[in-house]
Structure formats: C-alpha cells, structure tokens
Amino acid sequence: MNAPAIFAKEYSDYADQVGIDFKVDFTQFTPRATYTSSSLRRAYFRGMKWYIMLPFFVKSADLTNYAFGISQLMAENPAQAKDYDRLESAIDFMVGGSDDLMPVDYLKALDAAKNAPDKEAAIMDYLTKAHNPKIKDMQANYPTVGEVQSADVLLDTKGMRFFSGKFILDSYWTGQLTQGDEANKPGYDQKLPPMASSLEVMGLLGSDYAKSQIPKLDFYKPTNSRAIDKAMKDLAAENATYTDADWMKNLYTGWLWTIKGLFDWQKTNAKSLPPFMQSVAWQAKVLQNASGFWTELRHATILYAKQSFAERGGGDGGCDNRKVPEPPKGYIEPQLLAYQRLSYLAKKTDAGLTEQGYKLNNQYPLKSFIAMMDTVIDYSQRELADAKLNEKVVSITNTDPNDPTNSCTTNSIDGTSDWENIRKVLTQDISDALPVPVEGPVLFAKDKRAAILADVHTGQDSNYPPHILYEGTGVPYVIFTAVDDANGPRLTVGFTYSHYEFTKPYGGQRMTDEDWQTNFYKPGDTYNAFDYVAKSLKPAVNYWYKILFAGK
C-alpha cells in the first residue's frame, strides 16, 4: 500500500486479534472530504482516525490492561479529561453516540468491581455486558467459510477506542444488509451480499421509487434476493418503532429524519401537490435530491461516523415614467415537512453549540439560515393553499423635476413584492446563510465546487474481491417545471442535485474530492473553480435516474 511516511509502519502492520484475523483498514487514514485543504486539517484527520480506528480488545488481556492504564491516567488529569469530554460531547451532539467502549466505561468497571471478591472477574463481567458495538468496521479473515456468525464476529471487535467511531443509523443499515464469508444470519435461508446501495438506504428512509429499483442492482441475484428482501423488511419494522424523539436525538439522525420528510411529505400529500410533482419522474428527482443530500451528510461526517466494512442603482433624478415590468414569477418547491425539519435542525445546532460554551466566529450564518427558512416555509404554505401572491404597482403624478411646467407620472411597487422576495431577497438570504470558512474568505477551487465524494461502505467475500462503495455529487442539473396555479401558468427554472453511485477496488489511497472532481472540472488555476470538461467525459448516470433524461 502507498502510505504517508508517518504511517508507513502502521500501514504495513496489522493487529493480531482474538480467534479471527482482524485487520485495521489503513486506507481509512487517507485524508479526504473537508480535511485536504491544509496540512493542519490533514494531520488532524490522521491523528483522530488513529484514535478512532484502533481498538483495545476486551478479549486481549494486554490490550485491556493498556485500556485501563489510559483510562486511569485520564481520571488523574482532570483538566485534560475535561477537554476530552468537551470534544467528545460536541461530536456526540453532532454525529451520534459512540459505538464502542470508551475510557469512561473502563472507569465504571473499576468502580463496579471495587468491592467484589474477585475484582478481575467482576471487571471482565462488567465489560462483557457493557455496550456492544452494532457496526463492524474492521476487516476479518476467517479460517473457514460459512461457519462463523456475523454477530459473533461483531462481538469479537468489542473493545475500547480512545475516540470511538460514532453509531450512525445508515451505516448500521448497510451493515445489516451485507456480510462477508460468515454463515447465514439466523432465520435467513440465503447469504447476504457483501455490497450495499444508496437505494436501500433511501428505501428505508421512505422512498418507494428507490425500493422499486433495488431488484435491478447488479448484486441482487436469485442466490441472495430473499435475504436482501428479508433484511429490508426487518429493518423497516425496526424503523417503524422509532419516535420523532428518536430521530431528533442528535444532529446526524435529525438530518436523516429531514431526508425522510422529503419522501413522507410526497406520499402523504400526493393528491394536493401540483401535477408535476405527482409523476414517477418526480419521484426519481426527489430520490436524486435526497441521495445528494445524504452524500453531503456523509461527506461532512466522514471522519467521525463509523463506516460499515462490507447579491440597487440610482437614476439621474429626471422623470422616469416607465411602467413596472411584469415580475418574473418564481416558485419554491413546496417540500413543507423537510423545510420545517431543516429549520428545527438549524435552531438545535445553534442552541446546542451555545449551551456547550462554543463561541464560533462562523456561527452567525445559522441565524440567517433560520430566518430564511421561516420565509421559505411561509411561501410553501401559501403555494399549497393556491394563494395569489402580491405585487401592488402604484402610479404617482408630480411636477417634472426637470420641467416645472409639466407633470410626471412615475410607477413603482408599493410596499413589499412577493415576487421580488422570491427572486432577490431569498437569493441574498441564501448567500448570507452560507458558512464562512474558519481559515478565511478565500477558498481553493476544490472547496467552491458542488462535486464532492464520500466512501460509505467496504465489502468483500470469497467470491467478490474487496470493493469500496462511493457516493458522489456532481455539477448541479438545471431543472424546468411547468407550473399552473392561482398566479397563472409559467415555466420556472432552478437547480437540483446530480448524484452518482459507484464502486472501486479496495487498496491504496481512498478517493478524495480532488480525484472525483477531475470528472467534471478541468485542471488549472487553483482558484478557477468552474472550467468544465465536455459533457461526454462526465460519469454515466445511474440507471435509476435515467427516467429524468428520457431514458438516456
């Protein structure tokens, strides 16, 4: 493997594990997403990934002793422990709870066993019964095929991580939908495949269109179709038990809940939505938006999330009697539930960071975003009620400032124009709500572009060489929609996500945004972001989006 010099030894060494040959996936140390823009970010990524990836296995006496030593050292240094807890709490709030044992668990084990006659046995009993991981993020090589249970393998990865990878629901799903060379899961008459798809994730978030496309996936075969269907059914049943409080417990799950709102709103309000939003093609468009949204979420949390391992002018003061032109009548896609949830998440983020004592120099755009979402929600509600939007034009006659013997009639918009609010005010609000980079206002081309990439799953078995599943966004598409409501028929134009899914063989460096962007942008000036390659050179569209392009 190619490896940064600082990790050359670690890339070549693999930890020996208990019973099964577990290997640390050192390709995960490739800095990517937002962590490639500076040497500081790259160093932070690698250092934090080390703490996240390397386990102190419970079943290893030596590693368990090391874990206790580290935990006790932290307890003996309260200032450092406080800093650690503050960082850990912020990550938990934004991404999710730890999926592995943490130093605090080992301190609790010591406390629980202090009065036990056999302290060592009591400690091990506590750790054995403590939080079990739900996501397997390590490569496992088995001595035999089809004998070891996936659940047993997962338990064998149990141990302390200094900064545990965070439990995220979508990685849990892909983990439950895949397997390597383990035996069939209990109650399954077929083995699951080693690879997953965004279609499955979107299906579990409520997209009926995504579910209808799963049987066309290249890994959906007669030998595993029943297993995939059963796993999807089991996970859907599990999801049905989640309350809104469950979905809102941290920001990451809240973003999934917002994506879910795109699909739920579409289904619940189908008959009251505009005709163009009732077609199968629109379902594909909503899927593309949701998948692009999800890709950005995975991109933002790529370090911490636990990945499964299968813009006025003035006149000259003369008489201007021109009429006010007809306003360009825009339209806001009325995804009311998603907008309400976005507003909630922004408020939760702002309040949560403030409560934890963070005073971020770039936090103020959140308040602009919240105000913008209030406006978007208001207009969406009015559109759904088929209300007429207002723009009142008034004519005022006064003396011509250039010729007192003549009169001058001027025309102007009286008060607030709904159409100008949609056309200009909201556009400015979007600009005001953009996050400000902590390094300063000047961005490299890479960080100005819409095309980003996130690896979300790694899978293999004895019949399928190891591959990495990537989710990417590309250059946004221009979308035209024919609207006919109380404000009259019109053709509206806007932008929508482009989303791509593909796999690449495992090994070496994992793909970065820079690698992915060569498919859409020409190389050159570090700050020239939007010099595009020919359309013919762009990646192929996934089959489930072809309905948006007349099947092409």
What are these model-derived regions, one by one?
Residues 1-552:
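Long, non-catalytic protein-protein interaction scaffolds
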